[in-house]
Amino acid sequence: MRATLPAFAWGALAALCCAVPLVAAADSATDRVAVLAQMGAEDDADEFGNLSLRGGALFGYQSHLQHWGLALQNAHYSQDGWSENVAGVIGLYRNQRADTLEGLRAEAGIVSVAGNARPVGDITWSHRPRESTGVELIAAGDVVGTRAAIERGISYGLLAASVEQQFGARVTGILLGGWQPFTDGNSRALLRARLIVGLLPEQGLSLQARWRQYRSSDRDVDDAYFNPGEYRNWDAGLSLRRRVGGWTVSGLAGAGRERVDQESWQTTGIAELRAEGPLAGKARIAVNLLYSRAAGFAATDDYWYGSANVNVIIPLAR
């Protein structure tokens, strides 16, 4: 479908993403409106950058875990004098328990890339049938972040399911399987696993070991993005999650190895830091920093990727 951002998408998206939560929100006398502002920056070894902006309104706002809304966004991709804007409209919905994060967290919408209207989103439904067991269903999609893929309007989707199981007081295992189709006809079968061992539970310190792999259905994607027939990666490291006042601070630092097809194993590394908490009044901010030295969508030797994101929610007085 060729369009910049079809007019019918606005109405259809608003109806799809907002009709149900609108009815539910109308019953609460404590609901209010909030302003949402997000900014993100990305860079990598290919000097492929992305500056993303999102702004919108949240309705039926009870907390950062309970609201719905609409937002406009734009991602400005650039590399070596080339640039492209990918703009879109996004519907937002969140209804999760504060103690377990059970419930639904969803954002879904349409963006315009290379004259094509593409669906994007990130939807996760989580449930704990028992205190020691968790289940998640995931649906997601986005544009493929390389210059060649953006010029051709290539995007991807993701359908996945994961199971989390606690073994005793200190050990947790997570297994995820998924399918990742691309609009160019390629697809990937995904498998990921994680083992978490609590070292100092009272301090929030854990040891994590992770495995991820995928197999591609079509090796030839005309160099639009990094696409080996088979990719495998493992890493291990320390993670920390603590509450400091009203803030939640978490971090991860680790290293591992990756293998592309039958080539030799290469060293990888990852570092991540996230902080979320209150600002003045009822406002809330979340900051996330990430640095990774593992393969992504770009086919570059000694690849690295870095990102920084800031998310601010400001409830308005009624």
Predicted regions and their residues:
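Bacterial N-terminal signal peptides
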Residues: 9-21
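Gram-negative and organellar
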Residues: 25-318
